[in-house]
Amino acid sequence: MQSSLPQFTFKWPKGPEAIILTGTFDDWKGTLPMVKDPSGAFEITLPVTFDSPSSKFYFKFIVDGQWLPSKDYKVNIDEGVENNFITEEDVIKQRENGSSTLVPESAGLAVSKNAPLIEPEAEKRAKKLRKFKIKRVIKTNKQTGERSIFSQEVVELPDSEDETQQVNKTGKNADGLSGTTTIIENNVGVNEEKAIKPYEENHPKVNLVKSEGYVTDGLGKTQSSESRLYELSAEDLEKEEEEEDEDKGGGKDTSTSADAEASEDQNKEPLSKSAKFEKPEEKVPVSSITSHAKETSVKPTGKVATETQTYETKQGAPTAAAKKIEAKKATRPSKPKGTKETPYKGVQKNPAKNGGFFKKLAQLLK
């Protein structure tokens, strides 16, 4: 709102660095700095009052720290002190002319309005654009396809950072928004966290939930993945021991079912009869055993079948007993499955400890 009081524009030619206007209006305290225009001249407009048409308005300029009167205005000398002054007539004259002719350098310039002389620093700061960088973590569920923002962080960028560098760093995310975004995907809807290096310290890590898989064995029993791994390791151990027994024992058998059958028949037969066939290889011709072994496979089951046929012709064993032994040796029973708590230990047994193969076979055929 413009003041109804008459206004007057005070001017100073270009040259100094800073000029302050003071006078009776501020009790000579030097509180009104003048504004420097693009040409380098100084000017300021303020309302003036006069008690009577003959009253005077006293003022003076502080030029770069020195109190100086201007030669372009009227001068009054009071006790050796020079001060400038204007009257009501000077104000009316400047208003009619539209501009003052006192200073040639500033002729034709618009008269400045009463505005804040110094722009506050707070307003300067408010005009500056503030830059922010948004960091998001987006969680995606593969089953439903739903995407949700897991976390979001807003970081204010310092003024020294170049905006183009920030655009190159962040770019555009999958959701079309600017900022650094990490997408998390999972199959079962469980929160999983991938590497979020820039700000992982500011966010708690998401605990990973493992869904334990189950497998079904040949017997229809469901086992966990951990017990299945333990079972496979036991089978590998059994295979290694079987290979060692084949290399060392030659024609010795490692089947646990045949050992159990032989032990039962051995308990039934008297010890005197079993002693007669302690070394059966001396009574059976070597040529007959060798010829039969060539026709069968190298596996232990083939050897057992060959030797059973040889004793059937030599000793005259019952046909039913021979077929029974053949069927048991040809079809290996399924091995018991071990668990994590009670692993299967039957593979560590060695039939050689309980007696020779021919000794047991002689007892069965007798």
Curated annotation (Swiss-Prot):
Cross-link (Glycyl lysine isopeptide (Lys-Gly) (interchain with G-Cter in ubiquitin)): 314
Membrane topology: Peripheral membrane protein
A molecular function GO annotation: protein kinase binding
Residue list for modification Phosphothreonine: 216
Keywords, comma-separated and alphabetical: Cell membrane, Isopeptide bond, Membrane, Phosphoprotein, Ubl conjugation
Record field: compositional bias (Acidic residues): 233-247
Record's function text: Involved in G-protein mediated signal transduction and in the regulation of polarized cell growth in pheromone-induced cells.
Protein family per UniProt: Belongs to the CRP1/MDG1 family.
Protein name: Signal transduction protein MDG1
Organism: Saccharomyces cerevisiae (strain JAY291)
Gene: MDG1
